[in-house]
Amino acid sequence: MVMSRTLVLVALLGFAYVCESALITNLPGAPISNFKQYSGYYNVGTKKNHMLHYWFVESQSNPSTDPVLLWLTGGPGCSGLSALLTEWGPWNVNTDGATLRTNPYSWNKNASILTLEAPAGVGYSYATDNNIATGDDQTASENWEALVAFFNEFPQYKGNDFYVTGESYGGIYVPTLVQTILDRQSQSHINIKGLAIGNGCVSANEGVDSLVNFLYHHGVVDQAKWEHMKTSCCHNDTDACPWHSFSEFSACGEFVEATQQTAWNGGLNPYNMYADCISTSASFRFGMEYERRFNKKYTPEVLGTVPCLDESPVTNYLNRQDVRKALGIPSSLPAWSICSNAISYGYKRQYGDMTSRVLNAVNNNNLKMMLYNGDVDLACNALMGQRFTDKLGLTLSKKKTHFTVKGQIGGYVTQYKGSQVTFATVRGAGHMVPTDKPAVAEHIIQSFLFNKAF
């Protein structure tokens, strides 16, 4: 018995050491905070060659009972640290790139949030053997490994409600990870309750079909050209038109290609069509380039850069030597960048539609789900989200209606299966909803997590 107790004590002391060694005690340029935060690495992969960097902020309210969220930024190849410091995190980076200010609409006011830079090669995550080749299945598996490591490092959170959340290509990351969690519950049980996806690219074909219509209804497509395509390509039904199916070398295909070019290479800000395009940003200098998402025609994908957005403040902040030291980043690693071209180019996109995984989560495992879209985003437009959700075939329980935040219409919400599945649009927001409309973003995540009425 004495030996057993000694071993337990050693284990407990070892656990305390792991947590405290990852504790961020002084974050440069940040206001004084009332919550704990941690930064570290999880070693994952079949060869244990991938080191995934995480940044974990505890809830400002009651971390022992508040839900735990995982956040995954998309790309593929972009870092969640940008979201933490410019979207929903406890601080927003100032334009000086040296200091942070308190975010009054932070999601960690009553939720603890784990941000994972994934896959390896993104941000401060790296491969010990420099092999960062990966794809959807491997990323989901390694993210699951990181989650298991997280709950081993912080076992006090194993009983808390857990949600997987993300943005953009998170429309693939999130459902594939949720499926992996459900498939591996016998190996390591995770108390998952739901998933939330912001402006998620959840269907490649629907993304193409909806964007063509979205651009027309926003006054971007020439009327005479539209009428011609309507009759010659779509049998006078543009809503049901399979724009994605046309050959690239046909007249219909060339029209579809032209609309994609307009969205991504025509001078518009693809992340907020009514916002200015900031041509001074480092990423803009790469041009409004694109490649094929999911290896299919017509479907654009921003390279490992972020066109039209000025990411220099967050980049400058995360590359400060004292910030790197506070986060425990190895000095041998190169400078942080918001996105990785290497990941974006080499990533194996294995799935083009998330319908089956979402239905498995909702119907077979009773998980909650929310899809929310800024309504002026071109990258993953709101019409795609609406069509995807509606085509799940779930029982409609609340027809589309507006909701208000601070006395103003924040957007529109539709619910299915009671309130188990929610689709919400955010008025005037682009791709990064918490950046454009922080109060509305806080409202919808609170409604989702705590079953509050919209």
UniProtKB/Swiss-Prot annotation:
Q: Which PROSITE patterns match?
A: CARBOXYPEPT_SER_HIS, CARBOXYPEPT_SER_SER
Q: Which Pfam families match?
A: Peptidase_S10
Active site positions: S168, D377, H431
The residues forming the signal peptide are: 1-21
One annotated GO molecular function is: serine-type carboxypeptidase activity
Q: What EC numbers are recorded for this enzyme? A: 3.4.16.-
One Gene Ontology term of the biological-process aspect is: proteolysis
Q: Give the matching PANTHER family.
A: SERINE CARBOXYPEPTIDASE CTSA-1.2, SERINE PROTEASE FAMILY S10 SERINE CARBOXYPEPTIDASE
Record keywords: Carboxypeptidase, Glycoprotein, Hydrolase, Protease, Signal
Q: Which InterPro entries match?
A: AB_hydrolase_fold, Peptidase_S10, Ser_caboxypep_his_AS, Ser_caboxypep_ser_AS
According to its UniProt record, this protein's enzyme class is hydrolase
Which positions does UniProt annotate with glycan attachment? N110, N236
What this protein is called in its record is Serine carboxypeptidase ctsa-1.2
Is Protease among this UniProt entry's keywords?
yes
The similarity annotation says: Belongs to the peptidase S10 family.
